[in-house]
Design a protein with these regions (language model features):
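Active-site flanking residues adjacent to catalytic metal/cofactor-binding acidic residues
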Residues: 99, 125, 152, 206-208, ...
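Glycine-rich adenosyl-binding loop in Rossmann-like folds that engage adenosine-containing cofactors
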Residues: 48, 52-86, 145, 150-198
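Short, well-ordered alpha-helical microsegments
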Residues: 109, 132, 157, 214-216
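Conserved acidic-Pro-Pro-aromatic motif
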Residues: 193-285
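S-adenosyl-L-methionine
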Residues: 1-128, 133-137, 142, 250-285
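Short helix-capping segments at alpha-helix termini
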Residues: 118, 140-145, 199, 224-227
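Hydrophobic pocket-lining residues within nucleotide cofactor-binding pockets
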Residues: 103, 154-156, 210
Length: 285
C-alpha cells in the first residue's frame, strides 16, 4: 500500500515520508535505483534522471498504488513519446532550435533537450504555476542547460488571464474571465513579441499543445510560423466531442492557419483518440 501526504509541516516529517516512500518504491521495483526526495516539491529519482511530481502522494481514489512499471521506465517513455508524437516528420539534429508551447511538467523537454544536444536550444513555455515549477525543477535537476523555461500563456494579445486547474493536470486550460476556486492568474503574451524580446530567431521545430488555446495562440505567432521549418500543432476537437465545450473544436482552424503560413500538412490515421488531431506542417524542399 502506498502512502498519503497530509501536508507535513516540518522538514523532519517530509524526510521521514521520503524515506518510507523510497523503501516502498524499492520493494515494489527490485533492482531499480529509485529514490523519493523533497526539493521544494516531491521528486522521484530513477537512475540518473529526476522527475518532479507534485501529485506523487495524491493518487486517484481508484489507485491503491502508483504505476510502478511506468515509474521504472519514465525516461524511456518520454523519449519514446517524443519520437512518436512530435518527431513524426521533423527529425531533430544537433544544434537545432525547438520551441515548446505548452511544455507541461517537462516531459517533452526532457527528450527535446537530448535531441538537439549542447549546441541546440529549447524554449519551453508553460502557463500553469505548478507545472512550471515542476518544469524548472526538471531542468535544474537533470542539468538541461540548453533549455530556457518561460512562464506565460501564448495568446493573440497581451493581457491578464486565468488558467483552470483540472483533476488531470494535462487538461488544464487557459481562459479569460474572473478567477475561480481552481484557477491561477497568468500573463498572456503574443509569442511573436516574446520571441523578439528573447531573441528567438531561428526555429527548426515549433510544437504547440495547449488544450484548445491554439485558437488564440496561433494568431500571436504568425511571424514565428513563417520562419519555422516544421511545426506540430495539437488540436483538441476530441474534448469538444466529449462535451467539454465547442471552443475545443479547433482542427479546421489549425489546418487553415498552418497552411496559410506556407506549410504542407500531414495528418496521421491512428486509433489513439488524440493523435489524429496533431497537425504536422512541413515545407517542401
Amino acid at each position: 500500500m502506498w502512502v498519503t501526504e497530509t501536508e507535513p509541516p516540518s522538514y523532519e516529517d517530509r524526510a521521514a515520508l521520503a524515506r518510507r516512500a523510497t523503501e516502498l518504491a524499492r520493494a515494489a521495483m527490485p533492482g531499480v535505483d529509485v529514490e523519493i526526495l523533497w526539493d521544494g516539491m516531491w521528486v522521484r529519482r530513477v537512475g540518473p534522471d529526476y522527475f518532479p511530481d507534485p501529485d506523487m502522494f495524491r493518487l486517484p481514489a481508484s489507485d491503491a498504488e502508483p504505476n510502478w512499471e511506468r515509474w521504472a521506465g519514465q525516461a524511456r517513455k518520454h523519449l519514446r513519446d517524443a519520437e512518436d508524437y512530435w518527431f513524426y516528420l521533423y527529425k531533430p539534429r544537433p544544434g537545432d532550435v525547438i520551441v515548446d508551447i505548452g511544455a507541461g511538467r517537462g516531459e517533452d523537454v526532457f527528450a527535446f533537450s537530448r535531441a538537439v544536444g549542447p549546441a541546440g536550444r529549447v524554449w519551453a513555455i508553460e502557463p500553469h504555476p505548478v507545472s512550471f515549477a515542476a518544469l524548472i525543477g526538471s531542468c535544474e535537476l537533470n542539468r538541461l542547460a540548453n533549455v530556457t523555461p518561460l512562464n506565460y500563456a501564448c495568446m493573440d494579445r497581451a493581457g491578464d488571464l486565468q488558467i483552470e486547474t483540472r483533476p488531470v493536470w494535462e487538461s488544464n486550460y487557459v481562459r479569460a474571465g474572473a478567477p475561480s476556486p481552481a484557477s491561477y492568474p497568468v500573463k498572456g503574451v503574443r509569442f511573436d513579441d516574446l520571441a523578439a524580446e528573447q531573441g528567438i530567431e531561428r526555429i527548426d521545430f515549433l510544437k504547440m499543445n495547449i488544450e484548445g488555446a491554439e485558437r488564440w495562440a496561433l494568431p500571436g505567432c504568425e511571424k514565428a510560423l513563417r520562419r519555422a521549418r516544421y511545426v506540430c500543432i495539437a488540436a483538441h476537437d476530441f474534448r469538444g466531442a466529449r462535451g467539454e465545450g465547442e471552443e475545443f473544436r479547433t482542427l479546421d482552424f489549425v489546418k487553415e492557419f498552418v497552411a496559410g503560413a506556407g506549410f504542407e500538412i500531414a495528418m496521421r490515421d491512428d486509433p489513439r483518440y488524440y493523435v489524429p488531431y496533431h497537425v504536422h506542417g512541413f515545407r517542401r524542399e
